[in-house]
Amino acid sequence: MRTSQYLLSTQKETPADAEVISHQLMLRAGLVRKLASGLYTWLPTGLRVLNKVAQIVREEMDRAGSLEILMPVVQPADLWQESGRWDEYGPELLRIKDRHYRDFVLGPTHEEVVTALVKNEVSSYKQLPLNVYQVQTKFRDEVRPRFGVMRGREFTMKDAYSFHLSDECLNKTYDDMFAAYCRVFERINLEFRPVIADNGSIGGNASHEFHVLADSGEDDIAFSNASDYAANIEKAEALAPQFSRPAPSAELTKVATPNAKTIEQVSALLNIPAEQSVKTLIVLGEADNKGQQGLIALVLRGDHQLNELKAEKIDGVYAPLTMASEAQIEDTIGCSIGSIGPVGLNIPVIADRSAAVLADFVCGANENDVHYTGANWERDAKEFQEADIRNVQAGDPSPDGQGTLEIKRGIEVGHIFQLGSKYSEALNCGVLDENGKHQVLNMGCYGIGVSRIVAAAIEQNHDKYGIIWPDAIAPFKVAIVPMNMHKSHRIQQVAEDLYAQLKAAGVEVLFDDRKERPGVMFNDMELVGVPHTIVIGERNLDEQKVEYKNRRSGEKQLIDIPQLAEFVSTL
């Protein structure tokens, strides 16, 4: 491809509203252009990368036995009403009406559509298992689109769905798709982790997310330094301490703590470490077994953070987790938020495992500006239930018993689920089994963010000059930069000959034939991230050589022109 016939569209300046490096570089390198909030046009360079990612995904889906289909983006509302998600989904589901005032949605996902399809197309167990996928544009009306294509409203996604008669069959396909996802990210050469995850609004049983490690990631993932264990921090179990609670050695004492509302303030005032205190959070839940609304106390060690997902799965706690208002706390407990503690509370108390082994700890006294020192479980706080309700921390023992946990940020680029019969039951999707009995199907669901992978790859592969593409998804393999070509017939001839040779050999090459200064040409090739650059200059031509530069390593070397085509073929 000649740059004179190409829409290169590079920019020198970094757009002010681009927060993360991938967004900045995708705009500067001419990969995308913003149309509106969360909506982007893919320019030729970006589309070449996007298509390469999609092709790798397609190849691995085909290898895993999945069949490609294409479903409508616009979906009738009645399918979503049948599944129950019409009411469950929030405003991120874009609801529209046609000219006949019938309700439709712009699809964020396709569980309902594919289930309806299989219900009508598959009638016998002999047609199972069935695994289908599509690569398609999705739309989710994000409340705050950000980070460019990483969290846009419109995005390209591969979603696959499998149908089975048994859990065993579903498990096998799930494992096959898990392996296929690993191959996708390995082929692109990304550092990633498959992690145990929560199913969220999709529903179902087993679930794994695939995260590309990057400082700009929105998710914290915990993984062992000695095994393959990895989990989203929301799902990682915080093991109970391997020691018993010490016996009390101090008297319960009230101390004045004026204006000390936070753990940090109380710890500083009383000169104690935060881990020797507890904090008490009040949430809404069932006050008794009659289902009446009341308050529940969640108690954590002072230096630990509440895991809302774990907390809302405890019997009696409302989901989604809802914090009590200041007025509710004042009415029930008689103090403000910063002075609450588990001693003498007349509401259910749930203590995290790490808090439950403390002795002689500091806590709120349920009086404004007053705390207890020397508080102890059973002696002072008599009624409580132990549970895992905190986030794990770096250095915690790994839940699989091997090594300790590290915490890193991750960008979610894939998610697979075992859905079970959630959608097939709702839409009555089943077949006659070998005994002639109607059986509802088990389902699996497997998503990859194709456009998000492009951004995630940049987050892992860049320097101060621009993008450093992994070879598998680079828009071009080789760039030809002829310095001052329009002033030298000799340089032009060598460049044209090399361009023709590489094209004939099937190499994707970007030939910079613009009338630009060499510095501009070099900067653009580095910004765009072409892995290999051939620089043609007068001085080296005197020795029948050209200069080769590797974008990733920065390595430079002189190559004899007669050996150049063979050299490029080895890259």
Swiss-Prot record:
Pfam family, one: tRNA-synt_2b
EC number(s) given by UniProt: 6.1.1.15
Record key words, sorted: Aminoacyl-tRNA synthetase, ATP-binding, Cytoplasm, Ligase, Nucleotide-binding, Protein biosynthesis
Protein's job: Catalyzes the attachment of proline to tRNA(Pro) in a two-step reaction: proline is first activated by ATP to form Pro-AMP and then transferred to the acceptor end of tRNA(Pro). As ProRS can inadvertently accommodate and process non-cognate amino acids such as alanine and cysteine, to avoid such errors it has two additional distinct editing activities against alanine. One activity is designated as 'pretransfer' editing and involves the tRNA(Pro)-independent hydrolysis of activated Ala-AMP.
Quaternary structure (record): Homodimer.
Family matches, as PANTHER family: MITOCHONDRIAL RIBOSOME PROTEIN L39/PROLYL-TRNA LIGASE FAMILY MEMBER, PROLINE--TRNA LIGASE
Similarity annotation: Belongs to the class-II aminoacyl-tRNA synthetase family. ProS type 1 subfamily.
Protein name: Proline--tRNA ligase
